[in-house]
Structure formats: structure tokens, C-alpha cells
């Protein structure tokens, strides 16, 4: 026979701390019983009996706040664009970011493509693309043309240096009739030009050298074999 005293029952594990079940009534709920929200928990009331369970976990309130924040982030929609602008959503089909959606904005007059709302707003305010961002593209060609292709290779053409300017003091119409060349002394250049018995000055010789380089760079065929 148990030694426990009548009325001394262990706590019900289904009831939260501080909850109770009223002993009034016949222990059943009639058809008029209904649920009603009470502060800090959920209440069930009926004729002759009431049950109150404390469940102040705030789950519904957190879900409502999360939904409100997501709606704020989604607003405003594309109605902020001026009339005529076109919006295109493109889904990535390959790579680590497959499935992601990219949104592009197209300017109606020039067909320029912008990749973000920030770039569009900057363009509308200043009339030019934002510095430090990728230059807006002209999209009159097919935007899908380069999809699936490898990295574009840029062909660079070697820059040809411009020919030297013609000498200022050389008379192309009246060149010397006859020039003789003699070996230079030690410490001088290899050949020294002479007109008759007169040595050509160094400044004139440099003009001749510049004129020769100018002519041969423009007409290589005129160089005698």
C-alpha cells in the first residue's frame, strides 16, 4: 500500500511552470468552449473550467518582424525607373553561382546596360557612368552572343614609331654636287665628309645624317644597294 498522502501528486510534465488546472466544474468542456489569446500565453475558457498555459516564447512576433523586413528590402520595385527603361533578369546557368539571377537595366535612347540600381540612379543624376565601376555597355548587338565562350582575347598591334622630323637647315632642292669621305683620326667618328678640300662642319654633317634617316625611313627603296 502506498504511503503517499492524498492530494500530494508529482508535477505534471505537460504543464509549464506556474500553470494550473482548475478543479471547478465537471472536468469537461461544453460546446461553448473557445480559444482566446491572453498576454504571455494561450488560454482556453469554457463553462465552469479554464485552462491557462504559459508559453511566452514570442515566436509569432519574430516571424511577423522577419516578414516585414523582407518586404521592406524588396520595396520599391522597378517602378522607380523613368518611362521607357527596360529591365531584364538573367539566370546564370554555369559555374559556382549557377542559379543566381542578375538584373540588368537598359536605357531606352542609347541602349546602354547598367548592372545595378545604384549605377542607374547615378547616371540619371549626373548623366554619366559612375567612376570606379565598369563602363556601361552599348547593347545594340545581341547580348547573348558571347555567352558560353571563353575569355575574350585582345589583339594588340605593335606601335610603329613615327619617322624623325626633317632637318630644318638642310636644303633638299640644292644638295651638294660632290662629297668625298676620308678616314677620321683617333677619337673622331669613322668618316669625315669633305666638299672639295674643305671639311664639312659637324653641324652640317649632323643635318645630312638626319636627312638621310628621314628619307630612307619614308622610302626604303631609294637606298642604294
Swiss-Prot record:
Keywords attached to this entry: Chromosome, DNA-binding, Nucleus, RNA-mediated gene silencing, Transcription, Transcription regulation
Which Pfam families does the protein's record reference? MBD
- InterPro entries (alphabetical): DNA-bd_dom_sf, Methyl_CpG_DNA-bd
Gene3D superfamilies reported in the protein's UniProt record: Methyl-cpg-binding Protein 2, Chain A (3.30.890.10)
- Localization of this protein: Nucleus; Chromosome; Nucleus, Nucleolus
Name the GO cellular-component terms.
heterochromatin; nucleolus organizer region; nucleus; perinucleolar chromocenter; plastid
Q: What happens when the gene is disrupted?
A: Impaired nucleolar dominance. Reduced DNA methylation in some of the targets of RNA-directed DNA methylation (RdDM) and loss of DNA methylation in 180 bp centromeric repeats.
Q: Which residues form a coiled coil?
A: none
The record's region (Disordered) falls at 25-92
**Where in the body, by tissue, does this protein show up?**
Expressed in rosette leaves, buds, flowers, stems, mature seeds and roots.
Enumerate the Gene Ontology biological process terms: regulatory ncRNA-mediated gene silencing
Q: What is known of its domains?
A: The methyl-CpG-binding domain (MBD) functions both in binding to methylated DNA and in protein interactions.
Q: How does it assemble?
A: Homodimer and heterodimer with MBD5. Interacts with DDM1 via its MBD domain. Interacts with NTF2, RPS2C, HDA6 and AGO4.
Q: What does this protein do?
A: Transcriptional regulator that binds CpG, CpNpN and CpNpG (N is A, T, or C) islands in promoters regardless the DNA methylation status. Plays probably a role in gene silencing. May associate with histone deacetylase proteins (HDAC). Required for nucleolar dominance that consist in the silencing of rRNA genes inherited from one progenitor in genetic hybrids. Recruited to rRNA genes in a DRM2-dependent manner. Maintains gene silencing by interacting with RNA binding proteins (e.g. NTF2, RPS2C, HDA6 and AGO4) and by regulating DNA methylation status.
- The name this protein goes by in its record: Methyl-CpG-binding domain-containing protein 6
Q: Which organism is it from?
A: Arabidopsis thaliana (Mouse-ear cress)
Q: Which gene encodes it?
A: MBD6
